[in-house]
Amino acid sequence: MTELLHSLSTQNEFVARHNGPDKQEQATMLKTVNAESLDALIAQTVPAQIRLEAPMQLAPAQSEADMLATMKSFAKLNQLKRTFIGQGYYNTFTPNVILRNVMENPGWYTAYTPYQPEISQGRLESLLNYQQMVMDLTAMEIANASLLDEATAAAEAMALCQRAGKSKSNLFFVADDVHPQTIEVVKTRAAFLGFEVKVDSIDNITQQEAFGALLQYPGTTGEVRDLTDIIAKAQANKTLVTVATDLLASVLLKPAGEMGADVVIGSAQRFGVPMGYGGPHAAFMATRDAHKRTMPGRVIGVSIDAKGNQALRMAMQTREQHIRREKATSNICTAQALLANMAAFYAVYHGPQGLRTIARRAHHLTAILAAGLTKAGYELAHQHFFDTLAINTGAKTDALYQAAQQANINLRKLPNQLGVSFDETTTVADVEALFAIFGIKEEVHALSDRIATNELAAIPESCRRQSAFLTHPVFNTHHSETQMLRYMKHLENKDFSLTHGMIPLGSCTMKLNATAEMIPVTWPEFGALHPFVPKAQAAGYAALAEDLKQKLCEITGYDAFSLQPNSGASGEYAGLVAIQRYHQSRGEGHRNVCLIPSSAHGTNPATAAMVSMKVVVVKCDENGNIDMVDLADKIEKHKDHLSSIMITYPSTHGVYEQQVREVCEMVHAAGGQVYLDGANMNAQVGLTSPGFIGSDVSHLNLHKTFCIPHGGGGPGMGPIGVKSHLAPFLPGHIEGGVEGSDFAVSAADLGSASILPISWAYIAMMGADGLAEATKLAILNANYVMERLRPHYPILYRGANGRVAHECIIDIRPLKEETGISEEDIAKRLMDYGFHAPTMSFPVAGTLMVEPTESEDLAELDRFCDALIAIRGEIDKVKNGEWPLESNPLVHAPHTQADLREEKWDRPYSREIACFPSAHTKASKYWPTVNRVDNVYGDRNLVCSCPSIDSYQD
């Protein structure tokens, strides 16, 4: 390429779009941090002994247009056929108003988990709608705000049954008509919790005492039967019963809660969320009020704010890993908020009558097919069904299956049977096509007329729903597109996202989610594919996944990858399972001690507990590094039982520890494995790598380093990379392996496959040099923020040369002792300045951890630093007595528009200082919609359902 052509090329254009500071801004920032160049700063920050010796070997960077063209070539390899496989995944129509205004809207998908409720009331309301929807359709007393998928929800339900039950048994009963992928994930979880799983006919549920049982309703092959007596008998035998159910079926069927179930789980996928070759989708869990504090997952509750007005928040957070660590009953990272919101909006848009029509249509078409099959001499495995039939096809099975394939139709193949599942997209033409395949001579409309006289004949009377559902006004109001559009916009406007400003959350990497990366997610070639279609029909996904794995291996220094885990915590779990299986394969299954530094993220000990490891905490020294003497002592004490160490690099204290290689060598010498948490991978890419450092396994947070958006609290992805000796122990899957020996951790083989294009696109457009530059700029931005704030706030930890990694910790404890102003006061006051708070009290209580990422430019960094410096000035006014501790802009923060309207203002500071504390806020103001939320009130007066419509009035 000539020099002129090269200078005009768009090949590397995306790198400059993704990274915030341009060359001129970088020069200014380098001067502030007193570094001669960007490379000089990196040399002072990253230990020389772990720096990569050569650049990563990745394909040259692509322009946005070239990337999309390449992505389209992947998509075209996927074959879209009419699919009636069912098994927990169904075609659905995503209402266009939801597709465009939620799924494709950065106002919804770039928000963070609603830890800060004052700037999250919109999605909190939508998630509360989700909980109400689940509670109504399942007839249960409390529901959570989503889990990862139906299979992992079943595994969580098993753990709940063991925690909450009174049985001393070690047995968990699983009915043999539960979805096979669910059974496999339950088996994996049980194997490392020491539970025995018995898969048997539902009629044998009381042959042995079990602490819990899992039933499917309707069954995986479609059978609808009344479970009331079966559940009662099991409960009389001290067995807590979980029922996996279908939300659309629950519109017409008697809900599992009315049959006596203790726990109800399932997937909300068919409520407007594309199949996406397996995900992401929102699972649900509902239970009895008695079990609410042992239920996993986020729970949205109704509380009040400082003015006594209704305010929503995440309730019962004391169950979570960030507080209870290895004793946690829930991992707050494990959720699918964006998909739960889509499902909730689907229910709001259709309402109970719309859902009833959809359910009746799917059932009626199924009944027509059943009648036609019976007329043609076929035998149905079950006479009672909702939308799924199992047809006894015997010797004809293969021929009929192939005939369907020739007609571009996918059926579910079972031993001597074919399965057919209908959904809201099924048409009369589909039924006629199946009539042709099965040689049915009947006429569809004639059969329809006959069935209409007894429309629900295929549903036993005892299984027909009589109770009302979705009676709250929110589900009975927004049914025109105009109403729906305005309701969703009303909620969106309440929330702070990356569309408003920087979200400087430490350990969260809230970087740009570029539009080009997001575009392929909603292409039908990726979205409309069932995860269990024949492999040849998913060749595009296979090629994309394989190429992404190779890219990730090059970036991480690992030898193999699994893309199956649906979240970072799920990836941690899969990694520890791989380690334990490796030890078992060597006859060292007794190795069960996991060393975890005291600075570790709460998911680490919580995940170790999930594989029955004994957590031993390693101290950190005064500089925030692993205490090498204490580490040596712990290794020596536990060397015969040492399984692993879980470390994060750079450490959760925001520094590159000099002795990380020595840590790995010490653990290896004692027979242990090194798990390197990938949470801070954004400070490694292109400069070092987990494999080069010496670790054996890591999960990567694709929703951090590799640009999958956080979605307001999910989806995420946590693929794991391993060295070659652990590769045989990566999670398998029932569709691609032998049932019972695959150790699956998710319902689908590629987990949340439809968001993999996001990370592939990011890597492809950045190239090796762009990725390394992003890491360097993340480090520059963090050090710039640190240097600007250092004269005003204590910086808790810095590395060997006074540098931080990609984040820094501001120590508020001395200020609190001196003035009474807390880290929470500062976090809430930042909202008045137009910012989301940094991470509060992690990894050290009484601190704020700031991670600016590479995507923020100098102006935004300065706006943030100026805000914190101004807040320090406000703290000084409290210190000097100008403002009393009990009444100042910090303790009353955040301020709302309602504060401006108050007739009486008796505070010692002006309304302007309260609401417009900076020049930026006068020009462009983001308004919190409630005052500070009362967390204690919310937990003491727990309400997790939609409140009266009157309370929604502004």
From Swiss-Prot:
GO molecular function term, any single one: glycine binding
Gene Ontology cellular component annotations, sorted alphabetically: cytosol; glycine cleavage complex
Cofactor: pyridoxal 5'-phosphate
Positions of modified residues (N6-(pyridoxal phosphate)lysine): 704
GO biological process, one term: glycine decarboxylation via glycine cleavage system
Keyword Iron: no
Top-level EC class: oxidoreductase
Reactions catalysed, as given in the entry: N(6)-[(R)-lipoyl]-L-lysyl-[glycine-cleavage complex H protein] + glycine + H(+) = N(6)-[(R)-S(8)-aminomethyldihydrolipoyl]-L-lysyl-[glycine-cleavage complex H protein] + CO2
Domain of life: Bacteria
Pfam family, one: GDC-P
Enzyme Commission number, as recorded: 1.4.4.2
Keyword terms: Oxidoreductase, Pyridoxal phosphate
Function: The glycine cleavage system catalyzes the degradation of glycine. The P protein binds the alpha-amino group of glycine through its pyridoxal phosphate cofactor; CO(2) is released and the remaining methylamine moiety is then transferred to the lipoamide cofactor of the H protein.
Family the UniProt entry places it in: Belongs to the GcvP family.
Subunit structure: The glycine cleavage system is composed of four proteins: P, T, L and H.
HAMAP family the record matches: GcvP
Protein name according to UniProt: Glycine dehydrogenase (decarboxylating)
